């Protein structure tokens, strides 16, 4: 299995970066330590603080002109998916409690349905606008981030979060049958979250307070 080709490694705008998404122009990063959202120009790396979240931002994805951010709220860290409007912040309407009593950590959107991944349950679930679960895709590894590229899921995965062995796993579930799952590259750091800007992937090396861009290995 090939190693990822790192293209850039940059200081994150906030400590312990966790959530990450790309809206076509800007990267969006959520800090687990400060619970703040940041918008970043990926070329200049200039960042703008977009304000505090009503919880810990674990994962994010772009839905039209908005974001959906999954937050850990309250002492029990219940996961709630909330609307985030750039320039206006988080909205109270349209909130969805994550499935299985508030379980999940990362999000993606295929233009029609929202998807949520569950780390320890090793699966990706599709959700409708009310949070009802549709399809369920089981993976062989724990999931530390995912995004959708060309109709396929690309996931950051691991078999043991206490090691530094992580994988980029490609999941093609479009046939309607058993998904085709391939580990296509290896990462030697504790990656969190995954986004794609049309050319390269972005993830967070959370404990190093860095954001990393790497080449798409199957391009």
Regions found by a protein language model. Give the residues of each.
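A short beta-strand motif characteristic of beta-propeller blades
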Residues: 5-11, 45-51, 90-98, 132-137, ...
């Amino acid at each position: 299995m090939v190693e990822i080709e790192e293209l850039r490694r940059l200081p994150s705008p906030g400590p312990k970066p966790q959530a990450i998404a790309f809206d076509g122009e800007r990267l969006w990063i959520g800090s687990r330590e400060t619970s703040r959202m940041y918008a970043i120009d990926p070329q200049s790396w200039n960042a703008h603080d977009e304000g505090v979240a009503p919880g810990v931002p674990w994962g994010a994805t772009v839905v039209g002109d908005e974001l959906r951010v999954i937050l850990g709220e309250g002492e029990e860290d219940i996961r709630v998916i909330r609307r985030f409007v750039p320039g206006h912040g988080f909205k109270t309407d349209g909130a969805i409690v994550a499935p299985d009593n508030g379980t999940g950590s990362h999000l993606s959107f295929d233009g029609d349905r929202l998807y949520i991944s569950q780390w320890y349950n090793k699966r990706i679930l599709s959700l409708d606008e009310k949070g009802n679960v549709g399809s369920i895709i089981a993976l062989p590894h724990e999931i530390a981030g995912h995004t959708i590229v060309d109709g396929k899921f690309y996931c950051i995965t691991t078999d043991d979060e206490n090691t530094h062995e992580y994988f980029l796993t490609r999941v093609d579930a479009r046939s309607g049958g058993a998904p085709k799952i391939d580990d296509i590259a290896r990462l030697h750091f504790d990656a969190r979250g995954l986004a794609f800007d049309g050319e390269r992937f972005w993830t967070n090396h959370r404990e190093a307070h860095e954001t990393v861009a790497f080449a798409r290995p199957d391009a």
